[in-house]
């Protein structure tokens, strides 16, 4: 509803959507009149926000697409750490898998020969307690590295982040985000 109200205004020259959910909300009610700039999206192609790296598919929409962003990051993390089992937590939904860069992680794991240990028990809240439980489960499965995706429980402003990082530190599990 807010996205629709924004795009109906006549006094705006540009609307900026911050994050995948906001951009999807704007595009769902796009009237083609006001330019829309999408920012802060993990993977616009995988999220279905754009058609390709070359063409958004929407005349009044633009965003940056960094091809192979996550694949490159997973490769560098592996090259530096040489782990065997990388843990990933996510919400069991299409969006959750996109935010976790699961497709890229699976491809790189197969290419480089490491295993993914997955925890898909997060709700959309991604609370500290849910993430603590997820980390415990991943640790039991032998995780020796952890990918911190864009999860609420690891948000820099969230008070629950420090105990989660302390837990990973105690286990001597290297991380990257």
Predicted segments, located by residue:
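Short, well-structured alpha-helical segments in soluble
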Residues: 1-14, 25, 130-145
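Short beta-strand scaffold positions
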Residues: 16-17, 38, 148
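Short, well-ordered alpha-helical microsegments
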Residues: 22-26, 74
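Flexible loop/hinge segments that line or gate small-molecule binding clefts
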Residues: 37-67
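Short beta-strand elements in bilobed, periplasmic/extracellular small-molecule ligand-binding domains
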Residues: 1, 60, 106-128
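An alpha-beta-alpha
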Residues: 61-112
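Venus flytrap/periplasmic-binding-protein-like
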Residues: 35-48, 161-177
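Alpha-helix capping/helix-boundary segments
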Residues: 21-23, 152-153
